[in-house]
Amino acid sequence: MTYARIQGVGSYIPQQILSNADLEKMVNTTDEWIMQRVGVRERHVIANSPDNTTTMAVDAAKRAIEMAGIDSAVIDMIIVGTATAEYYFPSTACLVQKHLNLREDIPAFDINAACAGFVYALSIADQYIRNGGAKHILVIGVDSLTKVVDWKDRSTCILFGDGAGAVILQAHKEPGILNTILHANGDYSDLITAKSGVWERESVPHLHMYGKEVFKLAVTKLGEIVDEIIEKSGLKQSDIDWLIPHQANLRIIEATAKRLGLPRERVILTIEQHGNTSAASIPLALDAAVRAGKIKRGDTLLLEAFGAGLAWGAALLKL
């Protein structure tokens, strides 16, 4: 049997830091309130730097390729999860292909599942490798949500940061990704929006979110999906070594960890330093944990994410 196994990870965050103290000068909020309600102390932001969605994706990809120890010429697919592409078209994936000078006989495409984008992309890549359609896939989660937040809306501008994370998935005989599950419910599509498109435009496509409703649904749906994927995989909660959640809200993360019976020290947390980086948050956290020596080869990881759509998903894997 062929598995999709993570061979390398990489990430990138902009240099400029926006702290809660900075936000106190911009909107009516406090560091104490943000930490208690969300768990974010600072976030990295593109601001006026040369960074953008494409450049961050490229930098994260380079680091993942380097860790994987592969020649970039063997990459035979690129999938990018993003909701903040630099252009309507071409896709971010094609721009990554260009900047990395990858060969042309490969597919390269974006998928938009908002904050769940990386898990969605990982699931698609897993199916291609299992079915023999590819052997080395570059999967990237990247977003620049600080470019679409309303900096006068204290309920949302405190949440988000920018960044990118990438993995190299390689066909392998040893277990890698064990299972993925993806769900969506468009009936809740109005709960998180950034309305800018061909048919509906805002002069500035500000992000709007009904926070209380999203919080309740996230706790419920993520709790259900982690139970579902563990059962589907024939495992027990005690088999999970690490939870790597989407870094949206510390209270949501704690609710999922409690449901799994995992102590805080077995949960990878970067929300305090990064904020919510949308599709980038899981690969960013994974990269940080691997490079810090926390997560090691053979560990069983549970990834889960929830975002606009509403779309949510989970992945269970052996590193």
UniProtKB/Swiss-Prot annotation:
MF annotations from Gene Ontology: 3-oxoacyl-[acyl-carrier-protein] synthase activity; beta-ketoacyl-acyl-carrier-protein synthase III activity
Active site positions: C115, H246, N276
Coiled coil: none
Sorted UniProt keywords: Acyltransferase, Cytoplasm, Fatty acid biosynthesis, Fatty acid metabolism, Lipid biosynthesis, Lipid metabolism, Multifunctional enzyme, Transferase
Domain of life: Bacteria
Catalyzed reactions per annotation: malonyl-[ACP] + acetyl-CoA + H(+) = 3-oxobutanoyl-[ACP] + CO2 + CoA
EC number of the protein: 2.3.1.180
Entry's Gene Ontology cellular component terms: cytoplasm
Main EC class the enzyme belongs to: transferase
Compartments, as annotated in UniProt: Cytoplasm
Chain positions covered by the region annotation ACP-binding: 247-251
Pathway assigned in UniProt: Lipid metabolism; fatty acid biosynthesis
Keyword RNA-binding annotated: no
InterPro entries, A to Z: ACP_syn_III_C, ACP_syn_III_N, FabH, Thiolase-like
Entries under PANTHER family matching the protein: 3-OXOACYL-[ACYL-CARRIER-PROTEIN] SYNTHASE, BETA-KETOACYL-[ACYL-CARRIER-PROTEIN] SYNTHASE III, CHLOROPLASTIC
Role summary: Catalyzes the condensation reaction of fatty acid synthesis by the addition to an acyl acceptor of two carbons from malonyl-ACP. Catalyzes the first condensation reaction which initiates fatty acid synthesis and may therefore play a role in governing the total rate of fatty acid production. Possesses both acetoacetyl-ACP synthase and acetyl transacylase activities. Its substrate specificity determines the biosynthesis of branched-chain and/or straight-chain of fatty acids.
Family to which the UniProt record says this protein belongs: Belongs to the thiolase-like superfamily. FabH family.
NCBIfam families: fabH (TIGR00747), PRK09352.1 (NF006829)
Protein name: Beta-ketoacyl-[acyl-carrier-protein] synthase III
Organism listed in the record: Coxiella burnetii (strain CbuK_Q154)
This protein's encoding gene: fabH
